[in-house]
């Protein structure tokens, strides 16, 4: 049986997974570093890299045990090799290369963003092409996924990523880290129309986005408030999340128009939202309604596959394994690596 080992270490989650040729996830271990970074209110790159170094061996042993797999049963090793915090990327990539060399099994360097981009093919087995909204703490872009290694970026944030905006606003409100889930939780208790926030470049007519001005508006409001209690926090969270939903809904419409100009896929119209922000239930509902108006189906992975994980890396490795797209061991990890720069 073909088994793919995936390794993910691009940010603050140490993850290892094994999947089969039939897209079955045998094991998917994630060791979170949230408690290590919470005191700093964000991820500290050096701490993250050192934690990956100490966690990877344990994660690998747990995955092998849980999946009842021997190292010699592994067909290939796929590892995130960029983009991301370069210290962690190097640790994970070198760990994978060492296994590849020792086991004499192929190594496959995976673009972390491609892992997110292909997750819906792992979970829903959807065909190419499809429209992707990649929304996470480090990235926010609309992508036409035309095939394996064939990606066309239709638009991106011109400043902050949407996930970063969630985390920064949560920090302003003294909510726990990571901030995205905390904002969503508080928003359920608040009034989404209490505060009116700006929607930067919403009428630009293209697929680019901006969240910096929104973040600044929230900060200004908080600074000018005389009292901040739970009710105020809930209302700010709800109003902020509502505004994000308005921005993304508008930009999805722009992205659909741009996507349809470069594809002729009018039978199976799918929009995929991937990345940590895809776990937000409110945004799932809002964007599903928006997609339906245009005859599209919105697909989002289960929560445990929205955030960083190694199953998506293993699956991207499986697609490349099936196409014999292996990577030489002298491949250099990259802190920056656009989807459009992936080479097959």
Swiss-Prot record:
CDD domains: ASKHA_NBD_TsaD_bac. Binds 1 Fe(2+) ion per subunit. Substrate binds at residues 134-138, 167, 180, 280. Its cofactor is Fe(2+). Keywords: Acyltransferase, Cytoplasm, Iron, Metal-binding, Transferase, tRNA processing. It catalyses: L-threonylcarbamoyladenylate + adenosine(37) in tRNA = N(6)-L-threonylcarbamoyladenosine(37) in tRNA + AMP + H(+). Its EC number is 2.3.1.234. Pfam families: TsaD. It is found in: Cytoplasm. One of its GO terms (biological process) is tRNA threonylcarbamoyladenosine modification. The keyword tRNA processing applies. The keyword Cytoplasm applies. Fe cation binds at residues 112, 116, 308. GO terms for cellular component: cytoplasm. GO terms for molecular function: iron ion binding; N(6)-L-threonylcarbamoyladenine synthase activity. InterPro entries: ATPase_NBD (IPR043129), Gcp-like_dom (IPR000905), KAE1/TsaD (IPR017861), Peptidase_M22_CS (IPR017860), TsaD (IPR022450). Required for the formation of a threonylcarbamoyl group on adenosine at position 37 (t(6)A37) in tRNAs that read codons beginning with adenine. Is involved in the transfer of the threonylcarbamoyl moiety of threonylcarbamoyl-AMP (TC-AMP) to the N6 group of A37, together with TsaE and TsaB. TsaD likely plays a direct catalytic role in this reaction. Belongs to the KAE1 / TsaD family. This is tRNA N6-adenosine threonylcarbamoyltransferase. It comes from Rickettsia africae (strain ESF-5). The gene is tsaD.
